Amino acid sequence: MTILRHPLRFLFKPRFLYFQSPSGQSSRPFSTSQILRTALDMPPPPVDTTQRLAKLRELMAQNKVDVYTFISSFTGSAGCAIVSMSKAALSTDGRYFSQAAKQLDSNWTLLKRGVEGVPTWEEWTAEQAENGKVVGVDPSLITAADARKLSQTLKTTGGSLIGIDQNLIDAVWGDERPARPSNQITVQPVERAGKSFEEKVEDLRKELAAKKRSAMVISTLDEIAWLFNLRGSDIPYNPVFFSYAIVTPSVAELYVDENKLSPEARKHLEGKVVLKPYESIFQASKALAESKASASSGSGGKFLLSNKASWSVSLALGGEQNVVEVRSPITDAKAIKNEVELEGFRKCHIRDGAALIEYFAWLENALIKEGAKLDEVDGANKLFEIRKKYDHFVGNSFDTISSTGANGATIHYKPEKSTCAVIDPKAMYLCDSGGQYLDGTTDTTRTLHFGEPTEFQKKAYALVLKGHISIDNAIFPKGTTGYAIDSFARQHLWKEGLDYLHGTGHGVGSFLNVHEGPMGIGSRAQYAEVPLSASNVLSNEPGYYEDGNFGIRLENLVICKEVKTPHKFGDKPFLGFEYITLVPFCQKLLDASLLTEAERKWVNDYHAKVWEKTSPFFEKDELTTNWLKRETQPI
């Protein structure tokens, strides 16, 4: 199995995007368009993958492999493809059932994850590996834990798992595979990071000492960027760079292409971090393992490794006998923002809110007053141009989801100029977008209607808004997980027999990845593992989607914080949320009669704050001021 986003997309001839494995190390740029068709109105036919699969199967035969498995993750989510000598399957979750059903050609079977009676991808793979067949994976693209799990599953049907150092998808790709990017690495100054990298490294060393570990090998890109207060742009929308790192009690090593370091970055690291060639990480890991093996009995400890690190890194360090796999302490530390980072989040959300307000005012005027014919890409491009005007803007934090009508029901829809729909002023319009700013990262979704919504659309909007408000108002004891509060967002939909097939909230980085862990809010088991903590930044984004008709999602970012309560049961602190996104909800979709008095007060208080914080940007912009005044009026 290959945990990587590009192989599946290569088989399907994707658009130009970069994707990364969980550790981020095997990301490659590629060209994405045909099979990943995105329009629901007149979708082009699926790309015929017959020849690509045939080439892959030739290589499988040469490597004496009966089944080849690899993971494909869309932005912020996951899918898995498995190819045997006669069959091919794609497993994905509810966010992509509709999209995948439209995009797969006849060579592929869709495995709907979580649906009763449908096998998991591991079970399906085991079925193909019956009677001694061999399953091959690229060990650099699967975690050690996932490799062990898959191996155990295969044994139940008599199959076996082997690692293949050559990535067979790359071999099929051949010369068409673009080169790895080599963009400049810059410093995130302590004035914005809130803590020096020397302090962060020292904190990690204390963690190693407490756990009696001799070193930590770090392979997750946003962890490395955060740890060393550096930022890059090797992966679009994510300010990270291709690298590895090793931290011991006495030395910090960064494995990176030195030519990418800006003069400022070199000075930043000089005398404190040893620079090593990116490609030498596996040799260095093996040397660590050999050094441990030759050391006298009892000296040193096992190596600390993230449970998201690749199987190949674990093997280079000597495998389970030398490695302890844990949730990375860097991930935990990164998720708890310091006061400088939190203030940056608050400030960048005021500017980003102003940009979205300006965009929505422009869009309504263009569609309704001017009668302009604008497609979904035109809208996304205009929003980007508006954001660029605001201070400290670096770029988008993900592909803008600009979707009209039925396209809004595809949860992670991405419009393409050749196939996207014209924005229909008589239909719902869902816009999910975000920006990367030097002082923070944003992610906001609003659903609007420029005409006359139906009564059901207004009711569905109210149910989603009620869930959004329920999360925003939640108060819970320290130690509570996002799994425990997820139902707060869904309860109003459930009473009507409705639901949505995605999580309610994800962590967000500080001028880093717009999706980060380890915490989140959702109904999957993973959300029950890590409690929410004060100073986490998360999204609050319930939704509702009606295939072939419309989608609704309402998303703010929130800061988890300690709150005052009349009592303190068990002497435990209680936590709640502070919203930082400042964009009005759609007046045409707001039906005050469907909200309680407390909910109406929440909306009115929210809109008053939106007006207070963003209206000063539009003192010389009558169009936007009038739109904002109308959209923030009390209900």
Swiss-Prot record:
Binding site for Mn(2+) 2: 432, 443, 555
Any one GO MF annotation of this record: metalloaminopeptidase activity
SUPFAM superfamilies to which the protein is assigned, alphabetical: Creatinase/aminopeptidase, Creatinase/prolidase N-terminal domain
Gene Ontology, cellular component aspect: cytoplasm
Catalytic activity reported: Release of any N-terminal amino acid, including proline, that is linked to proline, even from a dipeptide or tripeptide
Keywords, in A-Z order: Aminopeptidase, Hydrolase, Manganese, Metal-binding, Metalloprotease, Protease
EC number: 3.4.11.9
Pfam family, one: Peptidase_M24_C
Cofactor needs: Mn(2+)
UniProt-listed InterPro entries: Creatin/AminoP/Spt16_N, Creatinase/aminopeptidase-like, Creatinase_N, Pept_M24, Pept_M24B, Peptidase_M24_C, Peptidase_M24B_aminopep-P_CS, X-Pro_aminopeptidase_P
Highest taxon of the lineage: Eukaryota
Enzyme class name: hydrolase
Binding site residues for Mn(2+) 1: 443, 541, 555
Gene Ontology biological-process entries: proteolysis
Note on cofactor: Binds 2 manganese ions per subunit.
Family: Belongs to the peptidase M24B family.
Role summary: Catalyzes the removal of a penultimate prolyl residue from the N-termini of peptides.
Entry protein name: Probable Xaa-Pro aminopeptidase P
Upper classification of the organism: Eukaryota, Fungi, Dikarya, Ascomycota, Pezizomycotina
